[in-house]
């Protein structure tokens, strides 16, 4: 791929709204089904893009940030402005029925039977299971009161109806850069169901966002760091303390998340180390495409100290802001940690800045990265730092995928890829070191 030089960064970053889709559609590394889907998106959204150009609006950067407005008011203003130009048409595209998706990307693969803890669901195409509750117990009515600051946090609990108690459990933190989205959003409800069908109880913690509330949970309070991180730790503690009531197996609790949720998974582990409660995550941490450093200094990116993925994959789904880029206000330290710079490099806010000493004694950890993600190499660098700290760490790279492309992004295009990641998470959660060594011979079908 053509390398993006520092001198062209600003011009490139202010490119048209479909720059990411065009990069994906042309990138030979990316799964062809995803490429075809993005080509169709381009065709559908080019009229919207043209309207934006006529109004001289190229993206979030060009919408006036009135310094007299508060942070939240500014965000609301930007969302309203963008909605005028149909940006959120993506939400409608995301609801396409299977026949429409197949008309874009071609026939979906026939799926294997989806294995449960005991028995199988009927054979079908994985795509069908993105929408159904068949074989699942879905409880979106529960909440708990945080022992840290008394905030009331909602949780989504999904598990197979045939799963035998006590349940191997994943405490999941959703992505969205710690600033947006919700565990109750349709993309996460689909992902939780996919995970649950691998023999797991999934408990999604709907922590406070630092940016704005999601339509799926519009009353969720908004607050910068450490509010959301506190909710995540409190969620883990609530699950552990109420294990009997929830039928959770205390010896098989994994914390996991993708993107911003990957950040929160690692920061929760750091918080647990500080509190002396790492035993609560008995199966460890599974962090996917973790967004762990916010805004890097431009010299760091162009020096290759963080690898080459920031340059190689720049603009594919993510445009991580650097230096004084206005995007930093929207998606980086300023939004998550507010204007108070004291937390901009706090490892519990941004684990990428953790030292080897900070990481010592953390529980076992999987760092999963995507080949075509700008964050790929900093995730790999973090994995190597974990090894230096003598943490039992593992790393996997999912080829042909962009940021989050094996979980919530493009799950309708590549359900088989997402299913493979779900299976890996299940194995990591259900068979931690204790269970591997204590398995009975009859349980190991070798």
Locations of regions flagged by a protein language model:
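A detector of tandem-repeat and repeat-rich interaction/domain scaffolds
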Residues: 108-128
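Alpha/beta-hydrolase superfamily serine-hydrolase fold, recognizing
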Residues: 3-91, 100-101, 127-446
């Amino acid at each position: 791929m053509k390398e993006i030089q520092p001198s062209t960064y600003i011009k490139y970053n202010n490119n048209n709204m479909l720059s990411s889709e065009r990069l994906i559609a042309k990138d030979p590394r990316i799964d062809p089904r995803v490429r075809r889907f993005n080509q169709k998106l381009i065709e559908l959204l080019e009229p919207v893009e043209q309207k934006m150009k006529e109004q001289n609006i190229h993206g979030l950067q060009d919408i006036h940030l009135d310094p007299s407005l508060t942070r939240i008011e500014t965000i609301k203003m930007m969302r309203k402005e963008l909605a005028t130009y149909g940006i959120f048409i993506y939400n409608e595209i995301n609801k396409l029925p299977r026949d429409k998706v197949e008309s874009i990307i071609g026939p979906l693969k026939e799926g294997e039977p989806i294995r449960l803890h005991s028995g199988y669901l009927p054979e079908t195409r994985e795509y069908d299971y993105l929408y159904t509750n068949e074989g699942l117990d879905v409880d979106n009515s529960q909440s708990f009161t945080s022992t840290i600051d008394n905030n009331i946090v909602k949780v989504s609990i999904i598990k197979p109806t045939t799963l035998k108690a006590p349940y191997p459990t994943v405490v999941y933190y959703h992505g969205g850069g710690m600033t947006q989205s919700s565990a109750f959003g349709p993309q996460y409800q689909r992902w939780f169901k996919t995970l649950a069908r691998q023999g797991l109880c999934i408990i999604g913690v709907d922590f406070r966002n630092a940016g704005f509330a999601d339509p799926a949970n519009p009353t969720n309070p908004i607050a910068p760091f450490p509010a959301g991180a506190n909710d995540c730790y409190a969620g883990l503690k609530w699950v552990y303390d109420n294990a009997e009531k929830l039928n959770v197996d205390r010896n098989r609790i994994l914390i996991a998340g993708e993107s911003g949720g990957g950040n929160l998974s690692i920061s929760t582990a750091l918080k647990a180390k500080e509190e002396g409660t790492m035993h609560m995550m008995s199966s460890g941490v599974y962090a996917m495409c973790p967004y762990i450093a916010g805004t890097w200094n431009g010299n760091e990116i162009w020096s290759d100290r963080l690898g080459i993925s920031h340059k190689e994959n720049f603009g594919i789904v993510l445009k991580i802001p650097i230096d004084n880029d206005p995007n930093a206000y929207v998606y980086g330290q300023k939004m998550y940690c507010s204007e108070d710079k004291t937390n901009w490099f706090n490892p519990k806010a941004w684990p990428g800045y953790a030292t080897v000493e900070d990481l010592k004694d953390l529980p076992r950890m999987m760092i999963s990265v995507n080949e075509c993600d700008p964050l790929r190499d900093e995730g790999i660098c973090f994995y190597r730092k974990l090894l230096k700290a003598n943490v039992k760490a593992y790393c996997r790279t999912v080829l042909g995928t962009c940021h989050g492309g094996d979980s919530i992004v493009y799950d309708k295009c590549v359900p088989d890829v997402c299913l493979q990641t779900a299976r890996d998470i299940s194995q990591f959660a259900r068979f931690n070191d204790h269970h591997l060594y204590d398995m009975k011979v009859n349980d190991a079908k070798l």
